Curated annotation (Swiss-Prot):
Keywords: Mitochondrion, Ribonucleoprotein, Ribosomal protein. One of its GO terms (molecular function) is structural constituent of ribosome. The gene is RSM25. This is Small ribosomal subunit protein mS23. InterPro entries: Ribosomal_mS23_fun.
Length: 309
């Protein structure tokens, strides 16, 4: 495509039109463009060879330092190298993950308090924050929300944002955590005292479903132990009768075995289970300790990076 020079020569062309009479009035932009002409000249000037000048087109045919050892057939690069492909930012169009400090504190709390997830929670919500809007996090205990791990998270954020003396996330988290511990201990003491008072006044508490299942299972186990002990006595008697010496009538009284086969078998199984459980427990404890330490280190590093940002 030919380079357009009309925009560059617009002042000279307008002045020639004014002198010739084609334009009767001077354009409004004429003085401004004449005072501040375009700096870039788009007119293509023919190249004049000389000894001082150097043709820049010859640089295209010169080998670079990294290509000097290549053969002459590799003068032109037709595709990108591995180094050039490795420098490409392929994740530039991906949606970045949203990271919040509340999520880091929440993960850290539930990692250190796994049994907090076993408490019942209300999962029916409209927008998710209608309860938090009503809460005043200047104190831990709230009227519209039960005490749980989310209370620790919100209380930590409130202390970090409103307390000028606290500048570290871990310090604010420790303050909120100890407040949470005090309230939990107070709740447990109140429940124990209320139960003791009700028992003192004659209240009778029904057994839980777990207790009822265990008692029913134990009844069936006791009945089966009686039947198994009787069968073992019969087997011992038949064995002693078959092993009676020649000439005997086989009617000698045989003392019943004090320990049945079932009880011996149960003891052996119990000992084996204890041994296996100890080994397994030691392995699991070692593995969980390594995983928790690694996870805690990762979370602490993430929180430090977030604070630095």
């Amino acid at each position: 495509m030919r380079i357009q020079t009309d925009a560059v020569n617009v002042v000279s062309r307008a002045s020639s039109y004014l002198l010739s009479g084609l334009l009767k009035r001077k354009p409004l932009w004429f003085d401004v463009v004449a005072k501040y002409p375009p700096k870039q000249n788009l007119i293509k000037v023919p190249y004049i060879q000389s000894k001082e000048n150097k043709d820049p087109r010859n640089d295209q045919f010169e080998l670079k330092k990294r290509d000097r050892k290549r053969p002459l057939s590799a003068l032109y690069q037709t595709r990108a190298s591995k180094m050039e492909n490795g420098n490409l930012n392929r994740k530039i169009h991906r949606i970045p993950k949203l990271k919040f400090l509340e999520d880091e504190i929440r993960d850290y709390f539930h990692l250190r308090h796994p049994w907090e997830n076993a408490r019942p929670k209300t999962l029916v919500e409209n927008s998710g924050d209608e309860v938090l809007r009503k809460c005043d996090w200047s104190r831990m205990l709230q009227l519209y929300k039960p005490l749980d791990g989310e209370s620790v998270v919100q209380r930590t954020m409130y202390i970090l944002q409103n307390d000028p003396e606290v500048k570290d996330v871990f310090e604010a988290y420790d303050i909120a955590r100890f407040e949470y511990y005090k309230l939990r201990m107070a709740e447990e003491m109140e429940s124990h005292v209320a139960k003791e008072e009700s028992v003192m006044h004659g209240a009778v508490f029904e057994s839980t479903h777990l207790d009822w299942n265990l008692t029913t299972e134990q009844k069936y186990i006791d009945d089966w132990v009686k039947i198994a002990s009787e069968k073992t006595q019969v087997l011992e008697a038949n064995r002693s009768k078959s092993n009676a010496p020649a000439g005997s009538m086989g009617g000698e009284e045989v003392e019943a075995a004090q320990v049945s086969i079932f009880e011996v078998f149960c003891k052996l199984v119990h000992q084996r289970e204890l041994k296996v459980s100890k080994e397994r427990r030691s392995r699991v404890q070692q593995k969980t300790h390594e995983e928790t330490s690694r996870a805690l280190y990762i979370i602490e590093m993430k929180m430090k990076r977030i604070l630095e940002k």
